[in-house]
Swiss-Prot record:
One Pfam family, short name: MFS_1
GO molecular function: lysophospholipid:sodium symporter activity
Species the sequence originates in: Escherichia coli (strain K12)
Protein name (database record): Lysophospholipid transporter LplT
Places the protein is found: Cell inner membrane
Amino acid sequence: MSESVHTNTSLWSKGMKAVIVAQFLSAFGDNALLFATLALLKAQFYPEWSQPILQMVFVGAYILFAPFVGQVADSFAKGRVMMFANGLKLLGAASICFGINPFLGYTLVGVGAAAYSPAKYGILGELTTGSKLVKANGLMEASTIAAILLGSVAGGVLADWHVLVALAACALAYGGAVVANIYIPKLAAARPGQSWNLINMTRSFLNACTSLWRNGETRFSLVGTSLFWGAGVTLRFLLVLWVPVALGITDNATPTYLNAMVAIGIVVGAGAAAKLVTLETVSRCMPAGILIGVVVLIFSLQHELLPAYALLMLIGVMGGFFVVPLNALLQERGKKSVGAGNAIAVQNLGENSAMLLMLGIYSLAVMIGIPVVPIGIGFGALFALAITALWIWQRRH
């Protein structure tokens, strides 16, 4: 598999299939590991406000390595970068299994994830082009969300049975992702021979940030995806505390089932976006973004399981329809200006900065004793207002 190959632009080429399988297994491990590690924190009597800290150390790795991972993705064959990154995730999951501090192990998984993300999205533009890129993003998002669906549930269910079994399953998933990466064709590096001087790399990354921010379309995409993923991660942790308060259920599995409803909805929304939205009609996704916040607000007031399931699925549908076109827009415009790997690295910086900020505010709210239902109401209202403001700004510019 070491030879270079010409790109086969089919959506179902051998390389694309390998990317999708590797992405599924890697994302499965990510999501199962989150809920397995949360169960470990509960079992070891960590305070409730420490739960979002777990995700904050994960996204902190993204932010710390943001200036460098884009160049890594563009300087080497992206399939090999993905394999190395999944190896780091495997090491992190295994370290938690063997009793190393879960925050340290999860940080290592975050380093692997930071290296993985620019490569996994950047390779799509090398395996397919043009009008197929939105569809390729739809496949990637669908496989990711299917992994979120199954991984989240598996992590919670296995953790209710035995936490160590859940952690071992995560390590096994990462091992499978490493194997799948072997079957991704070794495409030529997008931008080989770049300087590895850390100061120059940081300066180059900041230049990429500036270039993308000055372009109205890429700035619009960066802000939209950052708000979405920041809110999405915060919602996952809100559910962990909301379920016992609103529904009176205290197991590890129920929050994962509710997260699964969001995942199912995103698959549906991503498919709809691939059919109904093009790079020229991206603004069609904006009403869906506003509705996410409105439905989160309504959801926070529920006390029955069935309405909660339905509303979370609706949130997912709106989310998939909202984020897939924005991702495709950034990849297409970014590939032409700063390179796909750098564009995704800048996107990761924005998204993870938003996650860090939102999780920090959420953790602080929990720490000072604000009830989870008012937190959810305020969270939904602020998100709807933020997307409304973004849409108004986009229409004016």
